[in-house]
């Protein structure tokens, strides 16, 4: 599906570089962002993966989309805080309350092997028991949750603007700039976005597609720009940049034709860590790193057929493949090899957990082109013997290292003195062979004489043992709905009806009756 970005036609009065309206519009954007920044947007505690979701018939697309939202760190923490449901006036039909119940039940009150059935409130307005586009359902769900937030905000603050935690988490701002090629006057317009659609028809990677999005478009001929300063239509250039980056970056790879629904099934590489700074309208300061936490995948030939699943990164840092009711471990290598449809990135600055945070040294390694050169220089420096003075080394480098150097000759003297004292103490002055003495002297010097003071920006990373790649499940056909669930739960707890209690009493005599044949419990979130 191709998403068209439309921008308001530029006001000719704004073509002058010093037009005051331009700065006022930008100030409003910054002010709104500042107001929205009051929400806590990070994992407050490490969470494991959520439970699987029941396929009610061609519902794999909404299951995959809901799993990606459930494992969005800022959104999950907002849902777990119960902030909205405590003030909502109509929770029985509120989509945000339904999403809050789904996330809470999935992350906090489920066990391994449990299966949940998404609430009818979340799915009824969109799902018609046929295959749909997962990205369209994502945008529909975000907008309906945004409207639910606005209803509460307008009741408490009638004068509040159209801002919500949903836009605070996923919302960013485009800056569309038109520049007159004669007088160099510019006109800027700002528009909010919740996702970034990318044309991948000629791109080999997400980074290349991002660069293609920002290519300058020439406005000439019938499409020429009316310059307010020149007072006539003039050739101009139009550029599109991210002006304010979102906290959660949702990148959509346009794989489906808007007319036929046919899929562009080509490999497009995407990184685990992405620096958005080069794509900003004003790229100042340090890197703006994002970490991948979810990948939504479509396996099929058209948007009306095939199967959807996703890979998500849980709060404790491990990756899982969420395929309807099946939840299986996977590694980041297999995740990066998927034929992705929608990518989810989160700003590193908004994550607190070490298991998710990328260490500063890792950020530099991925984002800074000069880091590899610096790293190789440090490796060469570490290979030098601490017993040999490097007289050709600059003084400032020796000062930085702050290593107390000892020559090989001094090492021999210390060795002989130490062994002589030891021999006198035990009544034996016999010295060890010279080869062994060299080794022991080196050990003593390393333990007592050599002091290594790492620089302030040095980082020590202990790599875990590599594990074997987890097997990847081949995409299956649509899963059939589960039947004969042994235990039905809602977001408020067990369903205490006479029939269920009677059935439960009959089953208690059998061992393990709290699970079905697949070892799964069906949880109903109402």
From Swiss-Prot:
Keywords: Hydrolase, Protease, Thiol protease, Ubl conjugation, Ubl conjugation pathway. GO terms for biological process: protein deubiquitination; proteolysis. Induction: Up-regulated by IL3, IL5 and CSF2. Residues 374-385 have a biased composition (Basic residues). Pfam families: UCH. The gene is Usp17la. It catalyses: Thiol-dependent hydrolysis of ester, thioester, amide, peptide and isopeptide bonds formed by the C-terminal Gly of ubiquitin (a 76-residue protein attached to proteins as an intracellular targeting signal). Residues 51-348 form the USP domain. Changing residue 60 to S: Loss of activity. This is Ubiquitin carboxyl-terminal hydrolase 17-like protein A. PANTHER family: INACTIVE UBIQUITIN CARBOXYL-TERMINAL HYDROLASE 17-LIKE PROTEIN 4-RELATED, UBIQUITIN CARBOXYL-TERMINAL HYDROLASE. Residues 1-21, 374-394, 465-494 are annotated as: Disordered. SUPFAM superfamilies: Cysteine proteinases. InterPro entries: Papain-like_cys_pep_sf (IPR038765), Peptidase_C19 (IPR050164), Peptidase_C19_UCH (IPR001394), USP_CS (IPR018200), USP_dom (IPR028889). Expressed in hematopoietic progenitor cell lines Ba/F3 and FDCP1. Not detected in brain, lung, liver, kidney, thymus, spleen and bone marrow. Deubiquitinating enzyme that removes conjugated ubiquitin from specific proteins to regulate different cellular processes. Has deubiquitinating enzyme activity for DNAH5, suggesting a role in the regulation of DNAH5 degradation by the ubiquitin-proteasome pathway. Has growth-suppressing activity; induces arrest in G1 phase upon controlled expression. Polyubiquitinated; ubiquitination leads to its subsequent degradation. One of its GO terms (molecular function) is cysteine-type deubiquitinase activity. It comes from Mus musculus (Mouse). Its EC number is 3.4.19.12. Belongs to the peptidase C19 family. Residues 473-486 have a biased composition (Basic and acidic residues). The active site is at 60 (nucleophile), 307 (proton acceptor).
């Amino acid at each position: 599906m191709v998403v068209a970005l439309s921008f308001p036609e530029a006001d000719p009065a704004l073509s002058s570089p010093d037009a005051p309206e331009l700065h006022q519009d930008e100030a409003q954007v910054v002010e709104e962002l500042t107001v929205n920044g009051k929400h806590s947007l990070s994992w407050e505690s490490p969470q494991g993966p959520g439970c699987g979701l029941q396929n009610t018939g061609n519902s794999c697309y909404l299951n995959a989309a809901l799993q990606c939202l459930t494992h969005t760190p800022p959104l999950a923490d907002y849902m777990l805080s119960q902030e909205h449901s405590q003030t909502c006036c109509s929770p029985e039909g509120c989509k945000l309350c339904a999403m809050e119940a789904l996330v809470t039940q999935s992350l906090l009150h489920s066990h391994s092997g449990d299966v949940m059935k998404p609430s009818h409130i979340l799915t009824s307005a969109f799902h018609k028991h046929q295959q749909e586009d997962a990205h369209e359902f994502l945008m529909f769900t975000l907008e309906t949750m945004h409207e639910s937030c606005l209803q509460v905000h307008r009741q408490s603050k009638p004068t509040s603007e159209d801002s919500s935690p949903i836009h605070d988490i996923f919302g960013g701002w485009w800056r569309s700039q038109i520049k007159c090629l004669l007088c160099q006057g510019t006109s800027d317009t700002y528009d909010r976005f919740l996702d970034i659609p990318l044309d991948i028809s000629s791109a080999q990677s997400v980074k290349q597609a991002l660069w293609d999005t920002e290519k300058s478009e020439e406005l000439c001929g019938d499409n020429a720009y009316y310059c307010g300063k020149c007072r006539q239509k003039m050739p101009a250039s139009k550029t599109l940049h991210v002006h304010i980056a979102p906290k959660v970056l949702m990148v959509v790879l346009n794989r489906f034709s808007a007319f036929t629904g046919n899929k562009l099934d080509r490999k497009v590489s995407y990184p685990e860590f992405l620096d958005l700074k080069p794509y900003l309208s004003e790229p100042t300061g340090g890197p703006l790193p994002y970490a991948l936490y979810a990948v939504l995948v479509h396996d099929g030939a058209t948007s009306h057929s095939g199967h959807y699943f996703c890979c998500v990164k849980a709060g404790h840092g491990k990756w899982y493949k969420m395929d309807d009711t099946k939840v299986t471990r996977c590694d980041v290598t297999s995740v990066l090899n998927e034929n992705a449809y929608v990518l989810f990135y989160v700003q590193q600055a908004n994550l607190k957990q070490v298991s998710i945070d990328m260490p500063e040294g890792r950020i530099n390694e991925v984002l800074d082109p000069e880091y590899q050169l610096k790293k190789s220089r440090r490796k060469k420096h570490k290979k030098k013997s601490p017993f040999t003075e490097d007289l050709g080394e600059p003084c400032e480098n020796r000062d930085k290292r702050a290593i107390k150097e000892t020559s090989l000759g001094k090492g021999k003297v210390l060795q002989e003195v130490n062994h002589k004292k030891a021999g006198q103490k035990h009544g034996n002055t016999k010295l060890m062979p010279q080869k062994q003495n060299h080794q022991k002297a080196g050990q003593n010097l390393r333990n007592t004489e050599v002091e290594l003071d790492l620089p302030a920006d040095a980082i020590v990373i202990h790599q875990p043992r590599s594990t074997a790649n987890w097997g990847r499940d081949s995409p299956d056909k649509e899963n059939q709905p589960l039947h004969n669930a042994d235990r039905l739960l809602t977001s408020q707890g067990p369903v205490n009806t006479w029939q269920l209690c009677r059935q439960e009493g009959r089953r208690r005599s059998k061992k393990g009756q709290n699970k079905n044949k697949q070892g799964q419990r069906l949880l109903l979130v109402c």
